[in-house]
Amino acid sequence: MTQLFIGLIAEGKTDYRFFQPIIEKTLTNIAFDCSGQIDIDVKVINCEKGDSFKDYVLNASKKGLQEYGISILIVHTDADDSNSIAAYDNKINPAKALLQTQPQNTHCNKIAALVPVRETESWMLADKDAFIKSIGTKKNINELNINGNPEDYTNPKERIENAIRIGREYMPKKLRTNLNISDLYSYLGQAIQINSLRNYNSFIDFENNIKSVFQELNLIPTQN
């Protein structure tokens, strides 16, 4: 059995609560294609962010290798846009280029980017039935104003907050106000299935990034 340690850095604390179970499910699925049995362990890398995104990635790469022996560093950043082009051009690609200049015995230089279009909260609506269940309402997606593609929403987080308010407005005040968006990250990360996320090009991009790094490490065969 091969032990594979994978590091994770994200923009904020709630992102970790949502993404870690999503990432673990994604990695488990991809590991089925590996030639041998692989035990995967995802490690959150707590480190100084420095003055720039590149500093953050560099610090995490070094700490992740030295403390955990990571082979891959998953790097999350929101696109904050209708596509991920600027995030790759201004953040991911420069960070990857910088890592290639670092010694392999001090830094992990294998990066897999995770870039949700708009923001993390877009992915939280990948399974709308799971979302509706999480807020405890019988209202439908039209009543909650969460119809359509969440990656097309200008502000997905605001949509979720409004949906929580609309979905629970009929409840007694004590119940109505005891749920907010921060309560949903862990639950939805566990509840949302990979097949639902595959409706998003940004998730397919992440999945392909993982597969590419697995191929570079000779864990899965290169596809022609």
Question: Can you say where each PLM-predicted feature lies in the sequence?
Answer:
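Conserved beta-strand elements of the Class I
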Residues: 5-9
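Short polar catalytic/cofactor-binding loops
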Residues: 12-14
